[in-house]
Amino acid sequence: MDIVSLKFIGVGLMAIGMYGAALGVSNIFSSLLNAIARNPAAAENLQRMALIGAGLAEAIGLFSFVIAMLLIFS
């Protein structure tokens, strides 16, 4: 295998990071809806914490995407 083939395999593996971020965000908001359904009075506090968690999970996916683009175009 040459170096170009290995670069594209690495980019394909970076998709796992983006897949994990998508699963994390969906899990966060699924849990948020369940928690708000159980305790509507705490909705504001729960929503704030969920958005912070979703932002952190999404950042991992964006870092993975940036690294994949660096691998492709370098």
Curated annotation (Swiss-Prot):
Q: What stretches pass through the bilayer?
A: 8-28, 52-72
Q: What's in the keyword line of the UniProt record?
A: ATP synthesis, Cell inner membrane, Cell membrane, CF(0), Hydrogen ion transport, Ion transport, Lipid-binding, Membrane, Transmembrane, Transmembrane helix, Transport
Return the Pfam families for the record: ATP-synt_C
Source domain of life: Bacteria
Q: Where does this protein reside within or beyond the cell?
A: Cell inner membrane
Recorded topology in the membrane: Multi-pass membrane protein
NCBIfam families per UniProt: PRK07558.1 (NF005733)
Similarity remark: Belongs to the ATPase C chain family.
Under the subunit heading, UniProt states: F-type ATPases have 2 components, F(1) - the catalytic core - and F(0) - the membrane proton channel. F(1) has five subunits: alpha(3), beta(3), gamma(1), delta(1), epsilon(1). F(0) has three main subunits: a(1), b(2) and c(10-14). The alpha and beta chains form an alternating ring which encloses part of the gamma chain. F(1) is attached to F(0) by a central stalk formed by the gamma and epsilon chains, while a peripheral stalk is formed by the delta and b chains.
PANTHER family (alphabetical): ATP SYNTHASE LIPID-BINDING PROTEIN, MITOCHONDRIAL (PTHR10031), ATPASE PROTEIN 9 (PTHR10031:SF0)
What protein name does the entry list?
A: ATP synthase subunit c
What is the protein's species of origin? Rickettsia canadensis (strain McKiel)
What gene name does this entry carry? atpE
